[in-house]
Amino acid sequence: VSGDYQLAATYCEPDSGPGSILQILTHGIGFDRNYWDTSYNNYNYSYVSKAVDEYHYSTLTWDRLGVGESSKGDPLAEIQIFLEIEALYELTRTARTGKGWDICASFQKVVHIGHSFGSSITNALANTFPDSTDGIVLTGFSQVSAYVGYFALGGNFVPVTDIPALSHKYPVGYVGSYDSTAVHSNFFSPGDFDPAMLDLAIRSGEAASPGEILTIGAGAGSSNAFSGPVLLITGGT
């Protein structure tokens, strides 16, 4: 696959200026870059707010290819994890050099953080391009292959043409979770979340491509040769 694509991204830095470390944040399936910076409850659940305001990191959130304000593509043959890995690599190269964007900053280190499918992309980036990152954080991530099937089944994915909130935003071929039960099953542990957050996740949910869902395992199945720092955060049952 080859082509020209546009990525929608948001850069944040402390009031005092750029942090020495840039965190590049990659969201999972069913979300966009706002996953990392929700304004609900006065930004109480915003990762970006904590990272920037309290710990003085710079952050870069982006809509993965095929999602939100980034370029769309063929949802089966084009928008797969392999293209997403390359997109994250190019975004990282741009961020490191500062060329091609209006940010006057240079960073001592770049750390990549992922959620769910975003963690699979982050893991694969570190394995494929180990020099592109100084450390990775994987949340909602597992190398147990059985969970891929559970995710696909629990997601209750239907064509976007059957979801009024998404049908006007995505071309035919994309899919989305049909109801709150699906999102609850895949992302919210019973009794451990604010119910209003589940409602927000449904209202602001985004679509996915079948190509992504079918290639999730490619980002997690093999051993990783990356020798830098790794933090893995995955909830139990």
Regions found by a protein language model. Give the residues of each.
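Short, surface-exposed "cap/lid" segments of acyl-processing enzymes
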Residues: 16-56, 60
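Alpha/beta-hydrolase
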Residues: 151-237
